[in-house]
A protein has these predicted regions:
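Extracellular/periplasmic, surface-exposed regions of secreted and cell-surface proteins
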Residues: 1-240
Length: 240
């Protein structure tokens, strides 16, 4: 993925007529600006899926993402994911249970990444000043610190769950527990000591955030006739 943008703007005043829409024809040209931006991203995905006798199910994915929003030191992020499932209702010992319609245990783990929004946030930026700043001469002032080691924010997710259904799928239960861990958090405008010559870093990696909990969902169809159907559902969860 590659995106390039070029732009030009002109600000003027004292137009000779409201019927003239070209700002360059105005009496006073106040400001002329131009610029360009360039962003590149490259990604790849490898995936392997396995299924045996409709009982044992597995999936493995590996994703690699590279972005020009990061410095050359930390440009690439590697994000794996794996999931395994066992449909125990297909086993001979459970097939004898006539009231059991379906049953599955599953476990999964995966990672995803987050990047900054602006492709130039990692670059050093300099401003030019008015001539009165230093002995009536213009000067160049550093405005933003270059971030060579800025890296991907990573979210790791674990999930363990069970799906089970009874009585021709008229009663189904889904239960799961999960844990999410966000590492190398991306902090926007992170404050730093003024003795550094700056007040903030545009982005800073630091810290982690953990989120875990459980959820239970129950659905029932106690009445299912030609002209009447009753659906009941119940959900409870806790997040820490």
């Amino acid at each position: 993925d590659q995106r390039t943008q070029d732009w030009t703007s002109l600000k003027s005043s004292r137009s000779p007529s409201f019927d003239i829409y070209d700002p360059a024809s105005n009496a006073v040209i106040q400001q002329i600006r131009s610029g360009s931006s360039d962003f590149r991203a490259l990604g790849g995905l490898a995936s392997v899926n396995y299924k045996f006798l409709d009982r044992y199910i597995g999936s493995f994915n590996l994703r690699a993402d590279g972005s020009s929003k990061f410095g050359a030191n930390r440009r690439w992020g590697i994000f794996p994911s794996v999931s395994v499932g066992w449909r125990f209702s297909e086993e001979a010992m459970f097939k004898a249970l006539k009231y059991l319609s379906d049953g599955k245990l599953r476990i999964s783990y995966g990672q995803t990444g987050r990047e900054p929004g602006n492709p130039y946030d990692r670059h050093a930026i300099y401003n030019t000043s008015n001539p009165s700043q230093y002995i009536d001469n213009p000067v160049i002032i550093p405005r933003q610190v270059q971030l060579d080691n800025l890296q991907w924010q990573t979210l790791s997710s674990w999930n363990l769950g069970m799906d089970i259904a009874f009585f021709n799928n008229n009663l189904s239960i889904t239960a799961e527990v999960y844990r999410k861990l966000t590492q190398d958090l991306l902090w926007d405008r992170y404050r730093i000591p003024k003795s550094s010559g700056f007040t903030t870093l545009k982005w800073f990696n630091g810290g982690e955030l953990e989120n875990k909990g459980w959820e239970l969902f129950v659905r029932a169809n106690p009445i299912k006739k030609n002209n009447l159907s009753v659906n009941l559902s119940f959900n409870i969860s806790q997040n820490i």
